[in-house]
Amino acid sequence: MAVSYDFRPISVCRARESNNVVVKKRSKRSLIGLSQNEMAEALKAIGVPEQQTRMRVRQLWHWLYVRGVSNFDEILNISKPIREMLKNHFSIARPEIVGEQISKDGTRKWLLRFPAREDGRPVEIETVYIPEEGRGTLCLSSQVGCTLTCSFCYTGTQVLVRNLTAEEILAQLLVARDCLGDFPNRTTPDGAIVPVEGRKITNIVMMGMGEPLYNFEVVKKALLIASDGDGLSLSKRRITLSTSGVVPEIVRAGEEIGVMLAVSLHAVHDTLRDMLVPINKKYPLALLIDACRNYPGLSNAKRITFEYVMLKGINDSLDDAKRLIQLLKGIPAKINLIPFNPWPGSNYQCSDWEQIERFADVVNQAGYASPIRIPRGRDILAACGQLKSASERLRKSGRLQIEYAVGNK
């Protein structure tokens, strides 16, 4: 079906009401990101009668995730006394939108600021919306910074500050839907390049800042809420979780989350992958590929996407293409070829386009889909591998604690 687009002049997204913007330090618990059972317990704890909690949870779930409210006064079918009780104890506010950049190709990048937690400081992350023919994809971050230091990735130069919470992951989706007019009875802003009909956000990918599987429980919780049929209702087939290769959590992700899997591969032998993706030293290719072969539900209808950044003179030879085919033999897969997106201080060059096409032809002739990802948002540093915020670094001991917890399960 043909999709038309809106090319009206650009205007920056603003928070709808100033009292919906998060302050520097939050004093109230947010209802965003709680499971339905957790929400029921939270309501009981503030005095909502137990016999009412299931009904109240259903009401709140609908208003938060279907209607997209960010102010308790907008909830029309809950009495004023209970709304006041909710306001006194909880928050459903959005994070602060520090900035919005809009690429010439329609890609949008938001810089979001979340309030301080415990003794920390407010942190900032980036979220990207990519409009395409017939769909809109939102790229979500799972951590502030990253611990993996992949040599071709800008995020890897920002050492990990902390994990995001389920609330903060879902808030990225809610803010984007606010800004795009993707909730009922909302208006799409001037300048938004989006499909005129249907949802503005049809797909989400966990491919922003951070390694999702180093924040497993939180990412799991957020994605299960995002895919809940009574709320945001995104199909699990339209949710993709990308990992650089945290092997112990790959099969578990398939069993407990059940979304589509993408693997940041980028090399066909350990020597090179150790340099490009240092987690390979801990989980080498043999272990990674074995985990992929055992991903639950793997089939031609549920293929794994292998991401392969094209680096000139590094990993782009036709011999590399042939070795890639052998490496993935027998795995239902799609291979996304990603032209390298430069960033300040990067030491790599993108492969020549003709070489990328030759590489793609070799892979395609072996029976694998090998689309070349068209760079989107390069001019605003919103393309793959270009995300970074200026938040404070986590102490080394904190980073090691996160890695140790995963590696010793």
UniProtKB/Swiss-Prot annotation:
Taxonomy, superkingdom: Bacteria
Keywords: 4Fe-4S, Cytoplasm, Disulfide bond, Iron, Iron-sulfur, Metal-binding, Methyltransferase, rRNA processing, S-adenosyl-L-methionine, Transferase, tRNA processing
Pfam families the record matches: Radical_SAM, RlmN_N
Chief site of localization: cytoplasm
Entry annotation: catalytic residues: 126 (proton acceptor), 384 (s-methylcysteine intermediate)
Cysteines joined through disulfide linkages: 139-384
List of residues binding [4Fe-4S] cluster: 146, 150, 153
Keyword tRNA-binding: no
InterPro entries: Aldolase_TIM, Methyltransferase_A, RlmN_N, RNA_MTrfase_RlmN, rRNA_lsu_MTrfase_RlmN/Cfr, rSAM
Compartments (UniProt record): Cytoplasm
CC cofactor note: Binds 1 [4Fe-4S] cluster. The cluster is coordinated with 3 cysteines and an exchangeable S-adenosyl-L-methionine.
GO molecular function: 4 iron, 4 sulfur cluster binding; metal ion binding; rRNA (adenine(2503)-C2-)-methyltransferase activity; rRNA binding; tRNA (adenine(37)-C2)-methyltransferase activity; tRNA binding
One of the record's GO cellular component terms: cytoplasm
Binding site for S-adenosyl-L-methionine: 210-211, 242, 264-266, 341
SUPFAM superfamilies (UniProt xref): Radical SAM enzymes
Catalytically driven reaction(s): adenosine(2503) in 23S rRNA + 2 reduced [2Fe-2S]-[ferredoxin] + 2 S-adenosyl-L-methionine = 2-methyladenosine(2503) in 23S rRNA + 5'-deoxyadenosine + L-methionine + 2 oxidized [2Fe-2S]-[ferredoxin] + S-adenosyl-L-homocysteine; adenosine(37) in tRNA + 2 reduced [2Fe-2S]-[ferredoxin] + 2 S-adenosyl-L-methionine = 2-methyladenosine(37) in tRNA + 5'-deoxyadenosine + L-methionine + 2 oxidized [2Fe-2S]-[ferredoxin] + S-adenosyl-L-homocysteine
Family, as annotated: Belongs to the radical SAM superfamily. RlmN family.
PANTHER family: 23S RRNA METHYLTRANSFERASE, RADICAL SAM CORE DOMAIN-CONTAINING PROTEIN
Described purpose of this protein according to its UniProt entry: Specifically methylates position 2 of adenine 2503 in 23S rRNA and position 2 of adenine 37 in tRNAs. m2A2503 modification seems to play a crucial role in the proofreading step occurring at the peptidyl transferase center and thus would serve to optimize ribosomal fidelity.
HAMAP family given in the database record: RNA_methyltr_RlmN (MF_01849)
Note: Reaction proceeds by a ping-pong mechanism involving intermediate methylation of a conserved cysteine residue.
Name recorded for this polypeptide: Dual-specificity RNA methyltransferase RlmN
Species of the source: Bartonella quintana (strain Toulouse)
